[in-house]
Amino acid sequence: LGMHGEEKWPLQRGFERFYGILSGACSYLRPSGGRGLTLDNTKLPAPDAPYYTTDAFADYAIQFVDEQKDDRPFFLYLAFNAPHWPLHAKEKDIQKFTKIYRKKGWDEIREARRKRMAKMGIIDSNTDFAEWENRKWDELTEQEKDQVAYRMAVYAAQVHCVDYNIGKLIDCLKKNHKMDNTLILFMSDNGACAEPYEELGGGKVEEVNNPASSFAPTYGRAWAQVSNTPFRKYKCRAYEGGISTPLILSWKGALGNKKGKWCRVPGYLPDIMPTILEATGAKYPETYHGGNKIYPLVGSSLFPAVHKKTDSLHEYMYWEHQNNRAIRWRDWKAIRDEKGKEWELYDVVKDRTERFNVAEQHPEVLTRLVTEWERWAHANFVLPKHPKK
């Protein structure tokens, strides 16, 4: 919403309580300055050690749920900064993973993940890897292996801590007898991050857990590709490795016990609002803040797909981020990468890892998709990338 104008802060946009950062990434250990903490409308000083954002964010979320004493519906948005860079984690969590990544390396782990995904039914057993963009594990020096294994262990520790704290929040819902009637939507905003696109990671490994750091170090392009197994590319890009993330949905009171059930109908971020509106029976407003007109609701509720009443929620789905463009229609997906001059076309049902560009074989499909993307971009004020000076 924006951190530089207080009128855009959460309490001025409809929330009753807020704790967290108004910026993007921050130090997990000592958020401060322009990337510091805010409680409601009050900027907070840098916290004293020991402090860890994932624990603190969850603890405040639990406090806010505990404060909700009546039976009115509540909406809680818990946005962890983990596992975004910088690499900050608790040492006891890091030690759980260090030996695993050093012993096996990224080639073996990538293959094991692909096999496990196929066994679980997440991907077809014949799904091929996207092209590997890094060195093989055996080509690294022993020192490089030590350093990158440690980076990945820190990243895994960040994810582990998120998992632990979600468990704490679920325990809180159960304690307050709210679990069965609470719709939980858990998702990531994008695929794994390769920034700054260096194979072994950005920043020095000695900077891990430096409280003063809000940016480096990172875990690197190679581990990001492992995290995105078996898909192509990373965060910011419009290939599946950038945009395809799982959504875990739970609502025992309304949906029953669907633990482990898969829904394979594609959806995307605009579907979250309609899903919540259907769940709560709320009405999407037409105006806000003194009569300012709100743009019409886009997206579709996910419930028809969850209940297996449809195998398609959208005629088209659209993406644009940092001049990376994509559109999906039926089995087809057209992409124009920021680094590419031409649109590409993939059959993402037969070729989920986008290995075979079939634009030349299906020009009529590509023309249709590009034309529709341009219409959508114009209607939604998507700006072209400004040329560098």
Question: At which residue positions do the language-model features occur?
Answer:
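Formylglycine-dependent
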Residues: 2-104, 108, 112, 118, ...
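Flexible glycine/proline-enriched surface loops and loop-helix/loop-strand junctions
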Residues: 40-47, 95-100, 146-152, 211-215, ...
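C-terminal cap/loop subdomain of S1 sulfatases and analogous C-terminal strand-loop tails that border
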Residues: 8-11, 16-17, 21-26, 213-242, ...
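Histidine-centered active-site microenvironments of extracellular/periplasmic hydrolases
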Residues: 5-14, 88-89, 171-251, 257-258
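A short aromatic-rich beta-strand->coil structural motif
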Residues: 61, 75-78, 247-249, 276, ...
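A long, amphipathic alpha-helix that forms part
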Residues: 58-66, 98-124, 144-182, 192-194, ...
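Beta-strand elements within well-structured catalytic alpha/beta cores of enzymes
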Residues: 61, 74-80, 159-162, 166-169, ...
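Short, solvent-exposed turn/loop segments enriched in Gly/Ser/Thr/Pro and often Arg
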Residues: 1-6, 21-25, 76-88, 129-137, ...
